[in-house]
């Protein structure tokens, strides 16, 4: 097997340039469709946002989300910046999240609202009440 030296971000750029109008990502349950170019633009926008809040190469970024379009966007945006992706189990309770954030040295936590009996936003507000005002 031959390896190459392109990063995930470089592959995304490559396909966005060579097949910009070809459909890349479909979330049929949400009626969302992205071409390579559209998805790359979405990723670049997210990467700029992450960069603006201090995410850079080597920064640990947690993703606490279900299978939603933003999960993949965060993955690629972090990869373009050289960040370290830390996936968070969607079933975690607050004490498990607190341990993981500390143990994995998570700088930035990207979240969705939550699933089943857990509200991710409320758990984070309980851990860091000052975020409610920011």
Describe these PLM feature segments.
Residues 1-3, 38, 86-88:
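Short, flexible loop segments at the rims of nucleotide/cofactor-binding pockets, characterized by
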Residues 3-24, 41:
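A short N-terminal helical cap/helix-turn-helix that marks the beginning
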Residues 12, 73-74, 124:
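Aromatic/hydrophobic pocket-lining residues that form π-stacking "cages" and hydrophobic walls in ligand
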Residues 14, 18, 45-49, 130:
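Solvent-exposed, charged/polar functional surfaces in cytosolic regulatory/catalytic domains
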């Amino acid at each position: 097997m031959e390896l190459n030296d392109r990063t995930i971000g470089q592959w995304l750029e490559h396909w966005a340039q060579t097949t910009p109008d070809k459909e890349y990502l479909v979330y049929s349950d949400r009626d969302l469709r992205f071409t390579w170019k559209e998805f790359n633009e979405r990723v670049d926008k997210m990467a700029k946002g992450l960069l603006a809040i201090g995410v850079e190469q080597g920064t640990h970024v947690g993703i606490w989300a279900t299978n939603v379009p933003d999960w993949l966007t965060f993955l690629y945006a972090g990869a373009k910046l050289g960040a370290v992706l830390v996936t968070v189990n969607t079933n975690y309770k607050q004490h498990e999240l607190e341990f993981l954030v500390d143990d994995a040295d998570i700088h930035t936590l990207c979240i969705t609202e939550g699933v089943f009996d857990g509200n991710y936003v409320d758990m984070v507000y309980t851990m860091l009440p000052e975020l409610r005002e920011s």
